[in-house]
Regions:
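Single conserved hydrophobic/aromatic residue that forms the stacking wall/gate
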Residues: 1-14
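Active-site-facing alpha/beta catalytic cores
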Residues: 12-56, 211, 218-236, 241, ...
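Histidine/acidic residue-rich metal-binding segments in metalloenzymes
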Residues: 24-131, 135-151
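Active-site proximal loops enriched in glycine and acidic residues that flank catalytic Cys/His/Asp
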Residues: 78, 102, 130, 307-309, ...
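Active-site-proximal loop/turn and secondary-structure-junction residues that shape catalytic pockets
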Residues: 78-82, 102-104, 132-133, 180, ...
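Short linear, low-complexity motifs centered on an aromatic residue
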Residues: 107-124, 142, 240, 247-249, ...
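Glycine-rich, acidic/polar active-site loops that bind/position phosphate-bearing ligands
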Residues: 155-339, 348-354, 358-601
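C-terminal amphipathic alpha-helical interaction region
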Residues: 538-740
Length: 740
């Protein structure tokens, strides 16, 4: 029989307290420490160069290594031998299936598992994995976000092997990193344009490096990500439908204690969390992910994981893999990992700092100062060209990290503002100022950590490691790299890396052209370089800001400087379709106008769908949880007032009931507001849903639905403070954030 409404309410209330009690009783899961040292089991499940050498013929091995290290074209004829070696290793490791593992425009990863088995022609089965299966498969392209490039009736798409990212084993499946493209050749994923952007920056940077060292043959873009996340007990998570459906809390009043004591950051890691981290690190190392750092973050139940930096494409694959691994391992420890940028209002959200740099095959970090004047001219050249790229494409870089989820975090006085600028620090700023203002070709002399000797009387010796840590800067120079801090915790790093590497590649090509033009006119090489650099420093001065990015004064100043100050995410996406953006991506060979248009359609559509889901969930919770609970408590208060009137004289009863009458009225007002605005929000959605343009529909959701969510939440959070705690069915912030 269906339980009565009263019985159902009691069950809901009991559920909250049961899951809290159960969570408190949970013990840390015991994690066995491997007998081997980490260096011995590192990359155990990866078909890396060591495994390639063992399982491939030497000719095939050399050809594959040449393709991986130097980008040499890979002859399709060797694919069968690579597949045979890969299959032999995988079967020895207990693998039964394989999959092409790719990153469609959904922000996550996709895979379809096929068994190795085929008919042997004799009524039995045999293990089979050919070069054709390794190199290419045909997933249904119309079933993934494609921005209109693929229709359901023309669904063919291809996933194609990326040899530069090694295959790996998860459970019983061999995962082969691949790109995903339409039948007509357009990229439908993140990896394909990322590889093109990395190739473009390699070529452009090598050309510029030849001014300083003709021996340079390859430049590699490096990425070191810092993954922030929250952990919530699985029982508490399940009792919050908003967390379950959207990844964030759509309601919930601040806990009396949150992060104001600053006692969580770098604090002792809770026992259950430490066990989770230990298992996660072991699994990550076996998959070749060089995890190094773990610690508590600022907010309660917020943590961070960071690896050693790697080549950008591989680092990005590893980040996608670690996010998948975190979700899986957390459940074994009774947690759910929250990768949403802002799961809880009132405490810090989560980001994913992207530490980006360029390095040569001769062992030089191009963003690091050197020991000779020539080295430091090279250093300044690459730093200033990066600033030029960020200046001319600051709107694009903002668009590359913008999303419905990251919008809650950016500019909230806890994360970088939604205006792209670059922090350089006092030392580097002085160097650039000197070059800008000098009238002769003074070469800068920096001697690394021993001190920065500038051979310039008016600038004293400085320590290069003394770059300040301006946490309010979205793109900060940190000694030998730039740290792109605006990237969201849930994002695919490739989006930001495609934009940044493409912009830098385009800028370096322009620099080479400008310098060569002066050299052709008879200008000495060093003078030509410094003259162009001097002009660039003046041109991109607006992007340099070392002050407080949280201040209102900076927003006004940024607007005066002509930087992109737009705050509407759907409008920010327009930066992808500006003529200068399209020209840049086409000049570097990274994406065509058609691909950019398709991606923007996906971005607008995804934005709309995420806000739409949040609106539906909040509406359901408001009508099915909040209003019934508040009304029930209101009824208890009304009954109390009537009993007071029957027990006491009218005047005394009125006095004793005054507060309850105020609460009754407040509950009535707030529930009426919630009901009225939920209904209005439903109607606003219906109006927006009729808009055919994905861009205009996303803007309508931003302008009407997002503010409605906040208004409804405000009144729900006020009711949470009024209603009897024993009646409130949903776990509160104090339980979600402090039960570990």
């Amino acid at each position: 029989p269906k339980p009565s409404s009263a019985a159902s309410d009691v069950y809901k209330r009991q559920l909250r307290f049961r899951v809290v009690e159960t969570a408190f009783k949970k013990k840390a899961v015991e994690v066995a420490t491997p007998v081997e040292r980490p260096s011995e089991y590192f990359a155990k499940y990866v078909f890396n160069k060591e495994k390639m050498f063992k399982y491939l013929p030497s000719k095939v091995y050399n050809a594959l290594i040449d393709a991986i290290d130097n980008g040499a074209p890979l002859d399709r004829s060797i694919a069968d031998e690579v597949a045979a070696g890969m299959k032999k290793w995988a079967i020895e490791m207990g693998v039964t299936h394989y999959t092409h593992w790719f990153a469609p425009l959904t922000e996550g990863t996709a895979e379809k598992h096929d068994a190795f088995v085929e008919h042997d022609g004799k009524g039995g089965m045999m293990e089979e994995f050919t070069g054709k299966l390794l190199v290419q498969q045909e997933p249904d392209a119309s079933s993934f976000p494609n921005g209109g490039i693929r229709n359901t009736f023309e669904a063919r798409g291809y996933s194609a092997w990326d040899p530069s990212s090694p295959a790996f084993i998860v459970d019983d499946t061999l995962c082969i990193p691949t790109v995903f493209i339409a039948y007509t050749g357009e990229a439908l994923d993140y990896k394909a344009p990322l590889l093109k952007a990395l190739r473009a920056v390699d070529k452009a940077a090598v050309d510029v490096c030849h001014y300083f060292n003709p021996e340079v043959k390859k430049v590699v873009a490096y990425l070191g990500w810092e993954q922030e996340y929250f952990l919530v007990d699985e029982g508490l998570y399940a009792a919050r439908p908003d967390l379950l459906m959207t990844g964030r809390t759509l309601m919930g009043h601040d806990s009396a204690k949150n992060q104001q004591l600053e006692d969580h950051y770098f604090g002792a890691i809770p026992t259950r969390v430490a066990a989770f981290m230990k298992e996660l690190e072991i699994e990550a190392l076996k998959l070749g992910i060089p995890v190094k750092t773990r610690h508590n973050e600022v907010a309660p139940n917020q943590f961070e994981l960071a690896p050693i930096f790697e080549e950008c494409n591989l680092a990005n694959d590893h980040n996608l893999l670690i996010m998948s691994l975190m979700r899986k391992v957390s459940r074994r420890h009774g947690f759910r990992v929250l990768l949403h940028e802002k799961p809880f209002k009132g405490v810090n959200g989560s980001g994913k700092h992207n530490n980006w740099s360029l390095g040569t095959d001769t062992g030089i970090l191009l963003m690091g100062p050197g020991k000779t004047p020539e080295d430091n001219l090279r250093f300044v050249t690459f730093v200033v060209n990066t600033l030029m790229a960020v200046y001319h494409h600051n709107g694009l870089l903002k668009a590359s990290i913008s999303s419905a989820t990251n919008a809650h975090r950016l500019g909230a006085n806890e994360a970088p503002p939604a205006i792209i600028s670059s922090f350089l620090g006092k030392q580097l700023s002085q160097v650039l100022d000197h070059i800008e203002n000098s009238t002769k070709d003074n070469l800068i002399s920096l001697s690394g950590k021993q001190g920065m000797k500038l051979d310039i009387p008016q600038i004293p010796e400085l320590l290069i490691d003394n770059t300040d840590r301006n946490r309010t800067s979205p793109f900060a120079f940190t000694g030998n790299r730039f740290e792109f801090r605006a990237v969201g915790s849930e994002a695919n790093c490739a989006s930001a890396m495609i934009a940044l590497n493409s912009a830098v590649a385009d800028q370096l090509a322009k620099f080479k052209k400008d310098v060569d033009a002066l050299i052709e006119k008879g200008e000495p090489k060093v003078s030509a370089i410094l003259e162009i650099i001097r002009g660039y420093i003046k041109e991109c001065k607006a992007i340099h800001f070392d002050g407080n990015g949280y201040s209102d004064e900076w927003k006004e100043e940024a607007a005066r400087r002509g930087l992109d100050c737009e705050t509407s995410v759907p409008v920010i996406f327009d930066n992808y379709l500006k003529p200068e953006t399209i020209a840049m991506f086409e000049a570097t060979g990274v994406m065509t106008k058609k691909e950019l248009e398709a991606r923007n359609e996906v971005k607008w559509e995804t934005y709309t769908k995420k806000i739409q889901i949040e609106a539906r969930v909040l509406g359901d919770l408001a009508m099915n949880h909040i209003i019934p609970i508040a009304t029930q408590y209101q009824t208890d208060l009304i009954n109390n007032v009537y009993k007071m009137q029957s027990l006491f004289p009218a005047e005394k009863a009125a006095k004793l009931s005054a507060k309850n009458l105020e609460l009754i009225e407040e509950i009535a007002d707030r529930t009426a507001f919630i009901k009225e605005h939920v209904d209005a929000m439903v109607e606003a959605r219906k109006v927006a849903n009729k808009i055919e343009s994905e861009r205009e529909k996303a803007i309508a959701y931003h302008d009407t639905i997002v503010p409605a969510l906040e208004e409804i939440r405000y009144h729900i959070d006020k009711l949470e403070l009024i209603v009897d705690n024993q009646m409130w069915t949903l776990p509160k912030y104090r339980e979600l954030l402090f039960v570990r």
